[in-house]
């Protein structure tokens, strides 16, 4: 089903927050529970063939609209609660606000998501941005953005007009009125109506969402200085207090069961220093020297160690020399 020019606005409801799996037939079966349905229209993207998350249903009788808003609002389709209200209310909100901007000279690569990410950073949008396209889905080079207040729209014009977007300077201004003769939105009459609505506390809520799969870009950190603190606070676990080597804080010894504690060797006055060697001792404290292996003779100790002043007394460790039985020459063993 498609939209009709002679649609009865008073007998039409607006359905928002639709899941991407919702089709015209599903919406028809749902709205049929409230009354006879004349037409179902879900605007779709010509390139991706996906809808923008909202649609319209025209009933045969105007009295069915109120009943449909009561029984269908917040009904879940594919796990998402839909939003249902009168289409005339949606039209009245847009007419009352009038903060609709025209964005021209768009690069062919600029789509609805780029417009949303760019202009949503300046204020609250009341509906998804629109890019005008031809019958083949190609961009016509302009689009529309709607804000919730004239103050935000004025700031967007001042900030974005003649700024580069996708390597092309864009033009941002108030859009022409559909029912006006060359008049643009944002005139004094619309601003007075918006001020009166704000004074009477008339709330304005967004009427649609981005196309399925589109999401606003995540803002980057404002400065590189706060990035390490954010990472440390969110992704790195706390480090336990481990005493550093050489710190003055005493560390208690480890307690291991069934193990005798190790004590360093103690030196008593009047006792000679004992050599820390695994050498068997004979009578009188002299080391036992094993006999030389066959084919080897005992060599005299080197006198160099005894001539060093202050050198500790070392036991005489035997060194052996290999005898060459063939030519009578001996070769000293590597030490």
Swiss-Prot record:
<dbReference type="InterPro" id="IPR000504">
    <property type="entry name" value="RRM_dom"/>
</dbReference>
<comment type="similarity">
    <text>Belongs to the SF3B4 family.</text>
</comment>
<keyword id="KW-0677">Repeat</keyword>
<dbReference type="InterPro" id="IPR035979">
    <property type="entry name" value="RBD_domain_sf"/>
</dbReference>
<feature type="domain" description="RRM 2">
    <location>
        <begin position="101"/>
        <end position="172"/>
    </location>
</feature>
<dbReference type="GO" id="GO:0071004">
    <property type="term" value="C:U2-type prespliceosome"/>
</dbReference>
<dbReference type="GO" id="GO:0005634">
    <property type="term" value="C:nucleus"/>
</dbReference>
<dbReference type="GO" id="GO:0005686">
    <property type="term" value="C:U2 snRNP"/>
</dbReference>
<dbReference type="InterPro" id="IPR034158">
    <property type="entry name" value="SF3B4_RRM1"/>
</dbReference>
<dbReference type="InterPro" id="IPR052084">
    <property type="entry name" value="SF3B4_spliceosome_assoc"/>
</dbReference>
<dbReference type="GO" id="GO:0003723">
    <property type="term" value="F:RNA binding"/>
</dbReference>
<protein>
    <recommendedName>
        <fullName>Spliceosome-associated protein 49</fullName>
    </recommendedName>
</protein>
<feature type="region of interest" description="Disordered">
    <location>
        <begin position="204"/>
        <end position="223"/>
    </location>
</feature>
<dbReference type="GO" id="GO:0071011">
    <property type="term" value="C:precatalytic spliceosome"/>
</dbReference>
<dbReference type="GO" id="GO:0045292">
    <property type="term" value="P:mRNA cis splicing, via spliceosome"/>
</dbReference>
<dbReference type="Pfam" id="PF00076">
    <property type="entry name" value="RRM_1"/>
</dbReference>
<dbReference type="InterPro" id="IPR012677">
    <property type="entry name" value="Nucleotide-bd_a/b_plait_sf"/>
</dbReference>
<dbReference type="GO" id="GO:0005829">
    <property type="term" value="C:cytosol"/>
</dbReference>
<dbReference type="GO" id="GO:0000398">
    <property type="term" value="P:mRNA splicing, via spliceosome"/>
</dbReference>
<keyword id="KW-0539">Nucleus</keyword>
<feature type="domain" description="RRM 1">
    <location>
        <begin position="13"/>
        <end position="84"/>
    </location>
</feature>
<dbReference type="InterPro" id="IPR034159">
    <property type="entry name" value="SF3B4_RRM2"/>
</dbReference>
<keyword id="KW-0694">RNA-binding</keyword>
């Amino acid at each position: 089903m498609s939209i009709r020019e002679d649609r009865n606005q008073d007998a039409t409801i607006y359905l928002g927050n639709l899941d991407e799996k919702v089709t015209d037939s599903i919406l028809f079966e749902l709205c049929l529970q409230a009354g006879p349905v004349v037409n179902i229209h879900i605007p779709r993207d010509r390139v991706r063939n996906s809808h923008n998350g909202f649609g319209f249903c025209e009933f045969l009788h105007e009295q069915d609209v109120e009943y449909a808003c009561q029984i269908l609002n917040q009904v879940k389709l594919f796990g998402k609660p839909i939003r249902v209200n009168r289409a005339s209310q949606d039209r009245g909100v847009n007419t009352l606000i009038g903060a609709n901007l025209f964005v021209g000279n768009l690069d062919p690569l600029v789509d609805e998501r780029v417009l949303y990410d760019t202009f949503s950073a300046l204020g609250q949008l009341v509906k998804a941005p629109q890019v005008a396209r031809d019958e083949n889905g190609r961009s016509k080079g302009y689009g529309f953005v709607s804000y919730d207040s004239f103050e935000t729209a004025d700031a967007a014009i001042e900030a974005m007009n003649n700024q580069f977007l996708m390597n092309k300077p864009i033009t941002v201004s108030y859009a022409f009125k559909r029912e006006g003769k060359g008049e643009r939105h944002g005139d004094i009459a619309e601003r007075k109506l918006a001020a009166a609505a704000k004074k009477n506390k008339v709330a304005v809520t967004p009427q649609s969402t981005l196309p399925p799969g589109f999401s606003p870009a995540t803002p980057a950190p404002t400065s590189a200085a706060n990035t390490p603190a954010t990472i440390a606070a969110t992704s790195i676990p706390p480090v336990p207090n481990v005493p550093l080597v050489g710190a003055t804080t005493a560390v208690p010894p480890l307690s291991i069961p069934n193990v005798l504690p190790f004590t360093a060797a103690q030196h008593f006055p009047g006792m000679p220093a004992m050599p820390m060697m695994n050498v068997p001792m004979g009578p009188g404290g002299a080391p036992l020297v094993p006999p030389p292996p066959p084919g080897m003779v005992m060599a005299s100790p080197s006198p160099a160690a005894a001539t060093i002043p202050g050198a500790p007394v070392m036991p005489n460790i035997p060194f052996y020399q290999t005898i060459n039985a063939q030519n009578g020459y001996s070769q000293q063993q590597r030490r």
